[in-house]
Amino acid sequence: MNFVAFERAKQGTGASRRLRNSGKTPGIVYGGSAEPQLIEVDHNALWHALKKEAFHSSVLDMELAGKTSKVLLRDVQYHPYKQLVLHIDFQRVDEKTKLHMKVPLHFTGAEESPAVKIDKCMVNPVATELDVSCMPSDLPEFINVDLSKLEKGRSLHLKDIKLPRGVSPVVRGGQQNPVLVSVVPPVAEVEAPAEGAAAPAPAPAKKGKK
């Protein structure tokens, strides 16, 4: 994906407020050997771009001052209750250096799995994204996870999925093989009393006062 940015000279609260009032969003680009660069982006174009999953998880082409450079979206600040982007951060990408990025997981085939189709279980995604390490050219927009063979009583772990070529998982917290998807059994129906079973004895009637 690509987007257009413009150089921004002024900074500070007042300058940023005036910029937002004119339909622009202040931002910054940092990283690499170059100095941090103040930028501004058209708010409407940015707002629509942020609705796309790929804008958050892909290497982006940023057009700035007649040049195109590779960047990653690193931070977005939203207004608490208005549909307004207050500030945005991008990081420059070195094509020869590995990067760390969270990539969305796309789950497919759950309805065809024995767990769902036969045993009427529910599939519960424990994780919706995966932290990975790879070269910029190998960064996938998403990772497809096939659930068609998932069975009742089984969970899908990190080592059960096939990652794209050149992509390695980044595991933190001591869990080398975390659960990505769990299977939830169906809620057991309340069993009706067997036909012919003795009915419970009625409670004794209370005696009235004399």
Swiss-Prot record:
Pfam families, A to Z: Ribosomal_L25p, Ribosomal_TL5_C
PANTHER family (alphabetical): RIBOSOMAL PROTEIN L25/GLN-TRNA SYNTHETASE, ANTI-CODON-BINDING DOMAIN-CONTAINING PROTEIN (PTHR33284), RIBOSOMAL PROTEIN L25_GLN-TRNA SYNTHETASE, ANTI-CODON-BINDING DOMAIN-CONTAINING PROTEIN (PTHR33284:SF1)
GO cellular component terms listed in the entry, alphabetical order: cytosolic large ribosomal subunit
Keywords: Ribonucleoprotein, Ribosomal protein, RNA-binding, rRNA-binding
Name used for this protein in its record: Large ribosomal subunit protein bL25
Region span, Disordered: 191-210
GO molecular function: 5S rRNA binding; structural constituent of ribosome
Record's function text: This is one of the proteins that binds to the 5S RNA in the ribosome where it forms part of the central protuberance.
One of the GO BP terms on file: translation
Keyword Ribonucleoprotein belongs to the record: yes
Subunit composition and interactions: Part of the 50S ribosomal subunit; part of the 5S rRNA/L5/L18/L25 subcomplex. Contacts the 5S rRNA. Binds to the 5S rRNA independently of L5 and L18.
Sequence similarity: Belongs to the bacterial ribosomal protein bL25 family. CTC subfamily.
Biased composition (Low complexity): 191-200
NCBIfam families per record: bL25_bact_ctc, PRK05618.1-2, PRK05618.1-5, PRK05943.1
